[in-house]
Amino acid sequence: MSRFFDAFEVYNKNKHAPADFKSHGGSSLNTGATTAYMFAREYRGPSTGEKKEAAAAALAADVKAGKVELVNDPNTADSSRKSSVSEEAMPQMVDISKLTREEFEALYNKINPGMLRKGEPNNKVNF
């Protein structure tokens, strides 16, 4: 009798399977031949140790690339190492509503070089 009600379930992997076949865990759709999808219930965030390792690796890569320099802070008693980001790597907050068109285009081209080629229409609507 319980097999009869299985046909009315919304999601049942074994709905159309033979009686002796049972799938145990996993997803039959993610076989590796196609794109594998991760659903929210399957996601497990990184542990604290993994986060620290990733942050240390990112800092080491930034130091190696020259984006960050490590300096000793004279204000602390133990003079621990702290990172100070160089001036060009720091994001700058700009109020674009107060910029002229030329200043905005110069700033935009500095941030996104090569986005618009010379003579290419920008497809913007002027109000």
Swiss-Prot record:
Coiled coil region boundaries: none
Residue segments, region Disordered: 71-94
Pfam families in the cross-refs: SPG4
Family: Belongs to the SPG4 family.
Function statement: Stationary phase-essential protein not required for growth on nonfermentable carbon sources.
Protein name per Swiss-Prot or TrEMBL: Stationary phase protein 4
Organism: Kluyveromyces lactis (strain ATCC 8585 / CBS 2359 / DSM 70799 / NBRC 1267 / NRRL Y-1140 / WM37) (Yeast)
Gene that encodes the chain: SPG4
